[in-house]
Design a protein with these regions (language model features):
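Short, glycine/charge-rich flexible loops or terminal/linker lids adjacent to PRPP-binding catalytic cores
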Residues: 293-339, 377-389
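Conserved short alpha-helical segments that host acidic/polar catalytic motifs at enzyme active sites
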Residues: 1-208, 214-271, 277, 366
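A generic structural motif
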Residues: 31-36, 298-304, 367-373
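Flexible loop/turn segments at secondary-structure boundaries
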Residues: 12-14, 102, 175-177, 196-197, ...
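Extended, hydrophobic alpha-helical segments in both membrane/secreted and soluble proteins
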Residues: 274, 281-288, 292, 296, ...
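Phosphate/diphosphate-binding loops
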Residues: 195, 202-203, 207-211, 261-267, ...
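A glycine-rich phosphate-binding loop feature that marks nucleotide/adenosyl-phosphate handling sites
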Residues: 37-40, 163-165, 276-284, 291, ...
Length: 473
């Protein structure tokens, strides 16, 4: 996915920018970059590969080089960024969190017009460069960003560091978040509000869909009003978000707790304890235990000092190894227990199957599973979710394809239909679980606590208020 952070202050910004960007590290592990601006020295940029190192270890030894009172940072799962640009709009640094489904089309369009693309990453078009080319075609930054909203099929949130402040622009449909923070003499913008607390910022406002603002050290001004409708990615609350973060005023951990509590109150399975698959399954498990009236127990613990999230590595074998090695079952708490596990989602199913087998081998009498979202039946066309680049990576779609029944996807995605029940039972069988239940869309929406029409649920039911064809008309 990726995360953004921007700081502008009356004092040097490097420390706040360093830690603020680091607090977005759970959103990506491929590359990271920082850029700062100082009136006399201009722009300074640094980019590092994160695939074999953490953000802090990459940047802490060179932090003194990032001088100036304003800067932007990015955790990226794709491009090398921020990019430095010199144009008729002036010099600026730009960072994005984007998924551009029509990148090839836009690239060919630019080339046909006599323009050129200078920066490639592993032979892949640099999306941030495409975005910058769209922006510099405007007479000002607002018109340029509106070009992005009009031309890009997918999603794009942007930070632009200029000589006159930081411009922040949220995706046109609000699919990816940006939130403003404030403290004495400084303003911040970030993807994750969890970045604010330890740095002394308080949440000032949630940037709306398509809204554009300019930050200065003493406050911010609106450059473009938000669009009237939004489609916020529901997976922000289910999986991506850090527990202390809030999106649209709704806290991640509270949402997960509410979801688990609702499932616990409705469930009838006989279990001795509830346990969450770390990290994003824990909040749901605590809620489930409260709703069901059974104890929450850490029958599985994550070895946190060195293991990152397992969906990040691009190689499936590496992902499986990371998933296995980072989670350590507690034999003494498993012996003879009927264990109910809670997890955020099931993508491929490989890791969950291995976890269930490990619990049984260490003495669990039964292993039940409850999932914090409905089955993932459709690949996401809007956000770079690293775990499902191809729909056939989804266990649901592999099963449906094996049954040669893809013309009935809507029925498989609808809770309670015969097709849905058959699919869930087949997943349960393949994962060697004693029982398996998914949250319903209704429970998920209620747990999030904002209107359903404001939430993107495409990966669950294939429907979005705005299709790729419609959204830019």
């Amino acid at each position: 996915m990726g995360g953004l952070c921007g700081i502008i202050s009356e004092q040097p910004c490097a420390v706040d920018l360093f830690y603020g960007t680091d607090y977005n590290s759970h959103l990506g592990t491929k590359r990271a970059g920082l850029a700062t601006y100082e009136k006399d020295c201009g722009f300074f940029r640094g980019i590092h590969n994160l695939e074999n190192a953490y953000f802090r270890s990459c940047f802490e030894d060179e932090l003194e080089k990032f001088i100036g009172n304003s800067g932007i940072g990015v955790i990226s799962d794709t491009d090398a960024q921020p990019m430095l640009v010199n144009s008729h709009l002036g010099r600026f640094a730009i960072a994005t969190v984007a998924k551009v489904n029509n990148a090839e089309e836009l690239a060919h369009k630019f080339l046909a017009q006599g323009m050129y693309l200078t920066e490639f990453s592993s032979g892949i078009i640099n999306i941030t460069e495409l975005i910058s080319l769209l922006i510099v075609r405007g007479k000002d930054f607002v018109e340029g960003i509106e070009n992005v909203y009009r031309e890009v099929k997918g999603s794009c949130s942007i930070l632009i560091l200029t000589e006159d402040g930081i411009i922040a622009a949220r995706d046109a449909w609000g699919r990816t978040p940006l939130v403003l923070g404030k403290k004495d003499g400084a303003m911040a913008v970030t993807s994750e509000s969890t970045a604010f607390a330890n740095l002394g910022y308080k949440t000032e406002a949630y940037i709306g869909p398509g809204e554009i603002v300019r930050l200065r050290a003493n406050g911010y001004e609106q450059l473009r009003k938000p669009n009237p409708r939004k489609q916020v990615c529901s997976f922000l609350w289910v999986y991506y978000g850090f527990p202390t973060s809030c999106y649209e005023g709704r806290n991640v951990e509270e949402t997960r707790f509410n979801c688990g509590k609702a499932m616990g109150e409705q469930d009838t399975v006989c279990a001795d304890c509830a346990c969450g698959v770390p990290d994003s399954g824990i909040g749901m498990a605590v809620g489930y235990a409260a709703g069901r009236g059974i104890p929450y127990m850490r029958t599985v613990a994550k070895y946190t000092p060195t293991w990152a999230r397992s969906f990040m590595p691009s190689n499936q074998t590496t992902r499986n190894l990371v998933a296995k090695m980072k989670l350590i079952p507690n034999r003494d708490m498993l012996e003879g227990k009927k264990v109910l596990m809670c997890d955020d989602s099931i993508v491929r199913g490989t890791q969950l199957s291995n976890n269930a087998q490990s619990l049984r081998e260490l003495g669990a009498a039964e292993v039940h599973m409850r999932i914090a979202c409905p089955p993932l039946v459709y690949a996401c066309p809007f956000v770079n979710f690293s775990a499902s680049k191809n729909y056939l990576e989804l266990i649901t779609r592999r099963i449906i394809k094996e049954w040669d029944d893809e013309e009935h996807l809507a029925e498989y995605a609808t809770t309670g239909t015969p097709q849905y029940e058959r699919m869930v039972e087949e997943i349960r069988r393949r994962l060697n679980l004693d029982s398996l239940k998914y949250t319903t869309i209704e429970t998920l929406v209620k747990s999030i606590g904002i209107p359903q029409e404001d939430i993107c649920l495409h990966c669950f039911n294939g429907s979005s208020a705005f299709t790729l064809e419609e959204e830019n008309r």
